[in-house]
A protein has these predicted regions:
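M16 family metallopeptidases and their MPP-like homologs
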Residues: 1, 38-49, 74-182, 202-207, ...
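Proteolytic maturation boundary segments
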Residues: 1-34, 39-40, 75, 171-254
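A broad, low-specificity signal for short, low-complexity segments enriched in glycine/proline
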Residues: 2-8, 21-25, 47-48, 60-65, ...
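Short amphipathic alpha-helical signal-transduction/dimerization elements
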Residues: 6, 65-69, 119-126
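Active/ligand-binding-proximal structured segments within catalytic/core domains
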Residues: 43, 53-65, 73
Length: 254
């Protein structure tokens, strides 16, 4: 089918993808968003893109911080109820990667306090204050997730999609887990100390209140439209006068 419908298409030169060089983040970039919903914050650090050492160690660092059960944020902040629903996630893209953090305040708590709590857990990683067994457990959990993913057609298809859109050679994509297994606790500690500081992130505060920056547009005068509900076209009249035979069932003869 591919040859039949697309076989005559000529192969053209593929455009070369070039990463747009972004300036380093040297001071905190803060943004505020206002609305009636509950307050929360999102914070992000920028890293190198897919198929780099950054992206692999970022995956491990993220799991040390938050893995839904035994991460530092899970234990020290969520289970101890220091805040509401804190966590983090990696977003691996072709040009750059993002390590995002989020959290909501308890009653009487400020978003700035939530930010400080999340940053404090990064400091714990820098100091190596997480158990030695956690790195091996993370690898086991990632392997289990990979096995479950490969049990479905959609999961296997997504593996091809990820490798394609991130421009990772298939053999290297399949070897990703082996590369993750080489990462040690010290690698994670060094990575955290080199890449996370108190001034190289972007943060968005979602605050409760009225957004006064919303532009107002004057309502235009709308010209009434006559819908002519009673009028019928000649075509409608002729169509309505046509006689249609009743549908009779046709039974299969076995």
């Amino acid at each position: 089918l591919i040859e039949k419908y697309w076989g005559e298409f000529e192969i053209k030169d593929q455009p070369t993808f070039e990463v747009r060089k972004e300036s380093p983040i040297t001071e905190v970039v803060e943004t505020e968003v206002w609305g009636p919903e509950a307050e929360r914050l999102y914070m992000g650090f920028r890293f190198n893109g897919a198929n780099t050492e950054d992206s692999r160690i970022l995956t491990m660092t993220d799991m040390v911080l938050s893995n839904s059960s035994a991460g530092l944020i899970d234990l020290n902040l969520n289970q101890s109820q220091e805040l509401i629903g804190g966590g983090c996630f990696p977003m691996i893209m072709k040009d750059y990667s993002l390590h995002g953090f989020y959290g909501s305040p308890k009653p009487g708590q400020t978003l700035e306090e939530v930010k400080d709590l999340l940053l404090s857990q990064i400091e714990e990683v820098k100091k190596g204050n997480f158990p030695d067994w956690l790195v091996g457990a993370i690898i086991s959990d990632l392997k289990l997730s990979q096995i479950k993913k490969m049990e479905s057609n959609s999961g296997r298809a997504n593996e091809f999609v990820d490798a394609f859109i991130l421009d990772i050679p298939w053999n290297e994509h399949q070897n990703e887990m082996a590369e993750l297994e080489k990462i040690t606790k010290q690698d994670i500690i060094d990575f955290a100390n080199e890449n996370y500081s108190d001034n190289n992130y972007v943060i968005v505060y979602k605050r409760t209140g009225e957004d006064t920056s919303i532009p107002k547009v004057e309502k235009p005068i709308i010209t009434p439209v006559s819908v002519n509900r009673e009028d019928q076209s000649d075509f409608l009249v002729s169509l309505s006068e046509e006689k249609v035979k009743d549908i009779e069932p046709v039974f299969l003869n076995f």
